Amino acid sequence: MELVQVLKRGLQQITGHGGLRGYLRVFFRTNDAKVGTLVGEDKYGNKYYEDNKQFFGRHRWVVYTTEMNGKNTFWDVDGSMVPPEWHRWLHSMTDDPPTTKPLTARKFIWTNHKFNMTGTPEQYVPYSTTRKKIQEWIPPSTPYK
């Protein structure tokens, strides 16, 4: 009887993603193919799911959109693509998703969510007011003879 339930759950995972093609697309993109109830969608197109049959910490997840802020994110997904209103629900800080209880407006929360810019030319580099302990060596410029 347990084998039947395992096969039934596997069939639900394949049909829950729109057939074999959709299942393989989700599996290769996220390395996981969970099926749950759709809780909501943010303004960027990310979809948020919940399945309380999973253990705590894996019972809520996001399926990222393929395009966000003009950037193709099909294979290049990043955890910073989750806006702050969904972050608190996704990490179990609250049981109420933003679809039922909207986030209160704060002046430090951006209206347009930004990616993590670490490792890009747009990254934040703070200005240092202290002298360096080690100075770069600049060779003397002498003309060739």
UniProtKB/Swiss-Prot annotation:
The keyword Mitochondrion applies. Keywords: Acetylation, Electron transport, Membrane, Mitochondrion, Mitochondrion inner membrane, Respiratory chain, Transport. It is found in: Mitochondrion inner membrane. It comes from the Eukaryota. GO terms for biological process: mitochondrial ATP synthesis coupled electron transport. GO terms for cellular component: mitochondrial inner membrane; respiratory chain complex I. It is a peripheral membrane protein. The modification N-acetylmethionine is found at residue 1. Belongs to the complex I NDUFA12 subunit family. Accessory subunit of the mitochondrial membrane respiratory chain NADH dehydrogenase (Complex I), that is believed not to be involved in catalysis. Complex I functions in the transfer of electrons from NADH to the respiratory chain. The immediate electron acceptor for the enzyme is believed to be ubiquinone. Complex I is composed of 45 different subunits. This is NADH dehydrogenase [ubiquinone] 1 alpha subcomplex subunit 12. It comes from Gorilla gorilla gorilla. The lineage of its organism: Eukaryota, Metazoa, Chordata, Craniata, Vertebrata.
